[in-house]
Every structure is written in structure tokens, then in C-alpha cells.
Regions:
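Conserved nucleotide-sugar phosphate-binding/catalytic loop shared by glycosyltransferases and other
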Residues: 3-9, 26-69, 154-160
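An aromatic- and histidine-rich active-site surface loop
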Residues: 40-44, 88-107
Length: 173
């Protein structure tokens, strides 16, 4: 069975697209593991959807303490990926992806990125050059990407939760 690690967290704008994609992959019998922070909403949202979740003790890079936590998280991520042996890693942006993507690079695990915003966030900007593919919501995102990397980008739009596709005639009135 194939295994994919999803890295997401912080806000619903990162978490819900990841859950939507993970649900579709689970339907194809792909084993999914989520890695996020142990401090934010993903620690509750992801397990509610019956996905395995591992939280890292990580903070945005704003202080010496957060840099130390980031370094420790890189080593923890290497340990997790070594144990789990995923076929792929998918990052959804945000500081949360940094230690796990570094671990994926160290362990030579292919990784993919998904960008929900028109302008790429710092983490995706830093890691897109070595990514296998980058899935973006908006074509305008390509304007900020060097020509030689554009073939890696695929405009997919933002993944939506299944509820957005189902009609409820009472709610439509």
C-alpha cells in the first residue's frame, strides 16, 4: 500500500484543502499520515476525519526559542519519516512544512506542494524549486515564478470539501 504524508496546519485555509485531497486519496487505498503542530486547530480537525496525526512542537520563526524548536522538529521529522517510510510528502505551505520538507530532502523522499493563495507563502517560495510538482489555485501565481520552473506548476484551483459539491434544496431556497 502506498503511503503519503500530508504537512498542514495553522488555519482552515491550509487544513481543509489538505483534508479534501487526503479523503480522495484514502478512497484509492492510500495510507495517509498528517503532520502538523501540537498547538493549533489541525490537532483536532484531522483526527475528527479519521486520519492519523502527529503534532510537532513548532512555532513561527520569530524568536530564538522558535528557531530551537524548528531544529528539534527537523530531527523529529527525520525520525518520523524514517519510521513511516512514505512514498511521497505533500506540503500545504506555512512554517509547519519547513522541518518535514527538510527531512524529506535529507531522506530523498519526493515532495509536492500545494499553494492556496495567489502569492506564494515563504515556505512554498523556498521549497518549490526542488518539488516534483506544485499545485496552485491561481494562474497569476506563475507571474512570480522564474520561467525555468513553470513547467512544475499545475493550476488546479483550490480543493473544496465534499459538502460544497452536494446540493441541499432547502438551503438553496
Amino acid at each position: 500500500m502506498k503511503k503519503v504524508v500530508f504537512i498542514t496546519g495553522g488555519t482552515g485555509g491550509h487544513i481543509y484543502p489538505a483534508i479534501s485531497i487526503a479523503k480522495k486519496m484514502r478512497e484509492q487505498n492510500i495510507d495517509i499520515l498528517f503532520i502538523g503542530t501540537e498547538h493549533r486547530m489541525e490537532k483536532e480537525l484531522v483526527p475528527k476525519e479519521n486520519f492519523r496525526f502527529i503534532g510537532l512542537d513548532i512555532l513561527p520563526l520569530k524568536s530564538i526559542k522558535s528557531v530551537i524548536k524548528m531544529i528539534i522538529s527537523v530531527f523529529k521529522a527525520i525520525s518520523i519519516l524514517n519510521k513511516e517510510k512514505p512514498d511521497k510528502v505533500i506540503g500545504f505551505g506555512n512554517y509547519i512544512t519547513i522541518p518535514v520538507l527538510i527531512a524529506a530532502i535529507v531522506l530523498r523522499i519526493p515532495y509536492y506542494l500545494q499553494e492556496q493563495n495567489c502569492t506564494m507563502g515563504m515556505a512554498n517560495k523556498y521549497f518549490y524549486k526542488k518539488a516534483k510538482k506544485i499545485f496552485i489555485a491561481f494562474e497569476d501565481t506563475l507571474e512570480l515564478v522564474k520561467e525555468k520552473y513553470r513547467s512544475k506548476f499545475i493550476v488546479t484551483g483550490n480543493p473544496l470539501r465534499e459538502e460544497f459539491y452536494t446540493k441541499n434544496s432547502k438551503e438553496e431556497r
